[in-house]
Amino acid sequence: MKSLRIVLYVLSVVFLTTGAFAKSLKMSRANWDTGYFHAEIYKLGLEELGYKIKKLKDVKPSVFYIGAAQGDVDLWVNGWEANQKAYIDETKGRVIPVGYVAKGGGMQGYLIDKKTAEKYNIKSILDIKKHVKKFDRDNDGKADLVACPPGWGCEKVITSHFEELNLGEFINPLKAEYSATLADTVAAYKNGQSIFYYTWAPNWIFGTLKLGQDVVWIHVPTKSRTKVAATNATMNEINFGFALDDIRPFANKSFLKNNPSAKKFLEIANIPVADISAQNFLMYKGEKSQRDIERHAKDWIKKNQKKFDGWITEARKFNM
């Protein structure tokens, strides 16, 4: 009996890896480019397990969670658990987290250039009100903030800050395509202008605008969170306004139940934040085509082959 089980296991591995009985898997990825790299690594891992995956469709969180709850999509690995909580809650338990891409890896907040912060003694986001002209690039009488597009979890948090602190009286949130707007901000900084933006880590921006050298985090006096010790900030302790978040895979609950091998892979795979940031900087430097991203992912796997193979071997044990 034991020999029969071994034979069946070996055959199942062969069939899955050769695609003889490959299952289709519907995977999406985030519509922000800093999430493309780890999505591609996870895609390659799932394909190694025998899943057939079409080209990943870029979607915003609000669209992903609705689709996953309805079974139109199976999973993505671009979940920010705290940031996207409102969308996650709306699925009523039909879409759940599994594993961690980067536990505690998602840092978020508002930054301004260090020179302006020090010259005008700007410590808090409320201090921007006294210096609107420094950040008003379109001359509408309000400071311009690079914010989040509609449908992103961070947009809801930023909106809550605007409502609680009446930020709309003196700040205009720019909600156009994020990467392009942020690139414009980098150009403005290089031209000597003051800058003000929301961002998160890991992100290519930190390879361009250095924390503590070019830019600093600023305090957000919201009641929803408390001050924490901070480096490269306007004070030794600030309220970032956002939770330190976990980047996680989220999947349809029924899919996970019916696909234990995929579930196990999602549980044990992970990508260091430093590696994600390094790849994001390559994209900023121009290596941003889909072919580039696929190459980056394959190169990462080669450099971490033993670890990657271990994930695959462990996940395959759950095919039976």
Each model region followed by its residue ranges:
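Short, well-ordered beta-strand elements
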Residues: 23-34, 51-56, 142-146, 266
